[in-house]
């Protein structure tokens, strides 16, 4: 995170020093305008939609630590794609370490009207995902959302499993789900996942929580 902050402050300083101030504005207003514009540049100046331009089903894989909100995000994303984008969506849980995650996703799928591919803790994540892909093709689904297992911390076994799963199903989008209250460790966690997977986007959850969290 430090390189990003350094680049940001350098850009603000470069633009702010020596900038002419219009008569209708004061220096503070001009500075805030520059900061706002640079923040937009860092965070992204436009909303980017999910890339679903592939032969159906477009596979979207979720990755992140346990408790970040991956399963809930899958439900919300399924609802968004169905209602806003008019897509036929199927969801599947490849989390064989937390059986409750499978039931949770089934409940969410029923609530939002998405297709649900059943799985059990006895199966292998790759077999689950491949079975879901076949089912999604047979059912003419546009999108398949794949929920994955998380851990309390980043470890080699977790990264190895998720790398193998990614290689097996080749998702068009791989989204990193992170808790907004993770704090400074979020950058390290994101780097670890990005080193293991070609992440295409980030989902920030619980951003309406305690502002002191992170």
Q: Model-flagged regions — what are they?
A:
Residues 99-102, 154-156:
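Conserved D-loop-proximal element of ABC-family nucleotide-binding domains
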Residues 124-138, 151-214:
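Conserved catalytic-core segment of NTP-binding enzymes
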Residues 1-94, 101-122, 129-146:
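Primarily NTPase-proximal linker/entry elements flanking Walker-type ATP/GTP-binding cores
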């Amino acid at each position: 995170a430090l390189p990003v902050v350094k680049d940001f402050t350098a850009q603000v300083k470069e633009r702010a020093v020596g900038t002419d101030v219009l008569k209708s504005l004061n220096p503070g207003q001009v500075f805030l305008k520059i900061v706002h514009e640079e923040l937009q540049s860092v965070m992204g100046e436009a909303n980017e939609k999910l890339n679903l331009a592939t032969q159906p089903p477009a596979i979207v894989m979720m990755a992140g630590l346990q408790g970040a909100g991956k399963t809930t995000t899958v439900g919300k994303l399924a609802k968004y794609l169905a209602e806003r984008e008019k897509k036929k969506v199927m969801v599947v849980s490849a989390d064989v370490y937390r059986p409750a995650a499978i039931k949770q996703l089934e409940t969410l799928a029923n609530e939002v009207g998405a297709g649900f591919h059943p799985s059990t803790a006895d199966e292998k994540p790759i077999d689950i995902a491949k079975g879901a892909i076949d089912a999604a093709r047979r059912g003419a689904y546009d999108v398949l959302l794949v929920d994955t297992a998380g851990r309390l911390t980043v470890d080699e076994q977790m990264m190895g499993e998720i790398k193998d799963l990614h290689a097996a199903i080749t998702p068009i989008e791989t989204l990193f789900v992170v808790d907004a209250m993770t704090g400074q460790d979020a950058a390290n966690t994101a780097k670890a996942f990005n080193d293991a997977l070609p992440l295409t986007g980030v989902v920030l959850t619980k951003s309406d929580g305690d502002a002191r969290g992170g």
